Amino acid sequence: MSRKQLALFEPVLLVQALTDAVKKLSPRAQWRNPVMFVVWAGSVLTTLLTLAMVTGQIAGSALFTGIISLWLWFTVLFANFAEALAEGRSKAQANSLKGVKKTAFARRLRAPRHDAQADNVPAAELRKGDIVLVKAGDIIPCDGEVIEGGASVDESAITGESAPVIRESGGDFASVTGGTRILSDWLVIACSVNPGETFLDRMIAMVEGAQRRKTPNEIALTILLIALTIVFLLATATLWPFSAWGGNAVSVTVLVALLVCLIPTTIGGLLSAIGVAGMSRMLGANVIATSGRAVEAAGDVDVLLLDKTGTITLGNRQASDFIPARGVDERTLADAAQLASLADETPEGRSIVILAKQRFNLRERDVQSLHATFVPFTAQSRMSGINIDNRMIRKGSVDAIRRHVESNGGHFPADVEQNVENVARLGATPLVVVEGARVLGVIALKDIVKGGIKERFAQLRKMGIKTVMITGDNRLTAAAIAAEAGVDDFLAEATPEAKLALIRQYQAEGRLVAMTGDGTNDAPALAQADVAVAMNSGTQAAKEAGNMVDLDSNPTKLIEVVHIGKQMLMTRGSLTTFSIANDVAKYFAIIPAAFAATYPQLNALNVMGLHSPNSAILSAVIFNALIIIFLIPLALKGVSYKPLSASAMLRRNLWIYGLGGLLVPFIGIKVIDVLLTLLGLA
């Protein structure tokens, strides 16, 4: 669920952006954008020339120079406005997060126990390692890990999702976020950060742009724009002696106008706004990016590692069948499977208990009265079970159970091997049940591939993105589901080490890899991946390792993250193409106007039939300023995104923004020229 979206032109934001745009007229602010700094310098110079003409210190048309100066200032203001509006939208989102931060007191425990003596201290005084007790109705004062207790927590202030979540000690759901509220029960929490370092603090800093640094692509584009600006500056500077030698020197005002119209002011003025808006759109999808670099990397990703459960399949695998080994009856298998699953709170574990009830009326036994030892599932052992009355019952993956049987001196039956293959070929997940060294049979867990996911993978393939399914299932099951879902490759029987090795393998081939994760065991792979989306419901280690956090904790969001990243890169590229193509029309407007008096042959370039030299120059300068305003919505919303191959996308954007960049100025400059003529300003 996403938080409330801001309107593109919120009235309050517009007023603030206008104020900020004026504040950004200072030289210190303009220096950060070299292209617009040149325009700013031209504005200052023409303003001084206007004043000198008005006071009679130099000859020239004060009205013409004054109008040129005014529109040059408008050009700078419009660029400032675009950046200020993008920043204002981000700050508004940050302010909504700041409302979550409340000055509160915390119960700091003197020992890591629920019943330990507590001191009431301001939440701001809590440090990493402090232990706090939080009760129903309290605001959780810090980020941390639950070390005792379990509670229902309202995280809507952070995630926008109204449904409460369960947070409890142990496992992957022990991480809590400061600023969320406990609805029931209590938690003992070990603070994991110092003041100012909480997840909420980092979210606010990121969204406000306080930590926004230029991304590598942004830096490369800025260098290109600076190079173009220097080239045009040198070219313009040589035109004055060139025209003077011809006997009719071009005025400084006209040369400044020519320079401003030729340098890439459109993309120069919108570049910063595009970057800020990209991070803002990511937040609109309920994803917090640690930097613009992370958003940009998402646009360059060409390998997606996707968890099978919850991303490709619905994630609610249910036990569908008991397939006993030769010499074992189905009821015996069901009874052992149910015992091994009594303490398993996963949907799969509960479904095994329920299936045994339905098939054989095996009632669920009281866990406490059994006096048994339960063995939890781990990523390393890949099995779980129970030790009860000298019985050692385990259920788990085929390889894990085979190793267990062989280590206990047993033999894995060939008929069970065949049953495992049959279940896997049908796309179900086989779990093998064993008692001691005796294999009892197979449980079939059936999962359902999400509707429409195959089409989404086909779209990603068109874009040149390889999809890899990550699953703990055996190779046969993984292959069946991979074929049904339409992924390009899969990693079966995945362990944290295998994921990390796979990421490094792709990166060694020069590819950019994106993945999701929520557990502490995912942290190494998340830290290695180029785009690492950690689930907000995951552990603190996972969130710290990733460079994005999905507040909805939805693994499928990774595909949307890639789309937003690509849209940002496409927007930047499209507007750069449009900006550079603009120069051609401005060239046809200003060159004849500036030099036709010296070289009448240049009148042939006046293909637009502009009214007069002054009108041509004014029209080009006015268009140059107005086009920034007209493109602000596109910079903030992003260009229309379609899943196409790189070559098809390039062709499409060249047609739309390249050809559009050529035609729009011809039309716009001519319309402005007609209006100026009608108003008597030509």
Swiss-Prot record:
Q: Which residues bind Mg(2+)?
A: 518, 522
Q: Which PROSITE patterns match?
A: ATPASE_E1_E2
Q: Which CDD domains match?
A: P-type_ATPase_K
Q: Name one Pfam family in it.
A: E1-E2_ATPase
The top EC class is translocase
Q: Where are the transmembrane segments?
A: 34-54, 58-78, 219-239, 254-274, 588-608, 616-636, 662-682
This chain belongs to the protein called Potassium-transporting ATPase ATP-binding subunit
Q: Which Gene3D superfamilies match?
A: Calcium-transporting ATPase, cytoplasmic domain N, Calcium-transporting ATPase, cytoplasmic transduction domain A, HAD superfamily/HAD-like
Q: Which family does it belong to?
A: Belongs to the cation transport ATPase (P-type) (TC 3.A.3) family. Type IA subfamily.
Reaction(s) catalysed (UniProt annotation) = K(+)(out) + ATP + H2O = K(+)(in) + ADP + phosphate + H(+)
Q: Which UniProt keywords apply?
A: ATP-binding, Cell inner membrane, Cell membrane, Ion transport, Magnesium, Membrane, Metal-binding, Nucleotide-binding, Phosphoprotein, Potassium, Potassium transport, Translocase, Transmembrane, Transmembrane helix, Transport
EC number(s) per entry: 7.2.2.6
Which Gene Ontology cellular component terms are annotated?
plasma membrane
- Sites where the protein binds ATP: 344, 348, 377-384, 395
User: From the UniProt record, which GO molecular function terms apply?
Assistant: ATP binding; ATP hydrolysis activity; magnesium ion binding; P-type potassium transmembrane transporter activity
Query: According to Swiss-Prot or TrEMBL, what is its membrane topology?
Result: Multi-pass membrane protein
Q: Which organism is it from?
A: Salmonella dublin (strain CT_02021853)
**InterPro entries given for it?**
ATPase_P-typ_cyto_dom_N (IPR023299), ATPase_P-typ_P_site (IPR018303), ATPase_P-typ_TM_dom_sf (IPR023298), ATPase_P-typ_transduc_dom_A_sf (IPR008250), HAD-like_sf (IPR036412), HAD_sf (IPR023214), P-type_ATPase_bsu_IA (IPR006391), P_typ_ATPase (IPR001757)
Quaternary structure note: The system is composed of three essential subunits: KdpA, KdpB and KdpC.
Q: What gene name is listed for this protein?
A: kdpB
- Alphabetized NCBIfam families for the sequence: ATPase_P-type (TIGR01494), kdpB (TIGR01497)
Location relative to the cell: Cell inner membrane
Catalytic residues in the record: 307
The job of this chain, per UniProt, is described as: Part of the high-affinity ATP-driven potassium transport (or Kdp) system, which catalyzes the hydrolysis of ATP coupled with the electrogenic transport of potassium into the cytoplasm. This subunit is responsible for energy coupling to the transport system and for the release of the potassium ions to the cytoplasm.
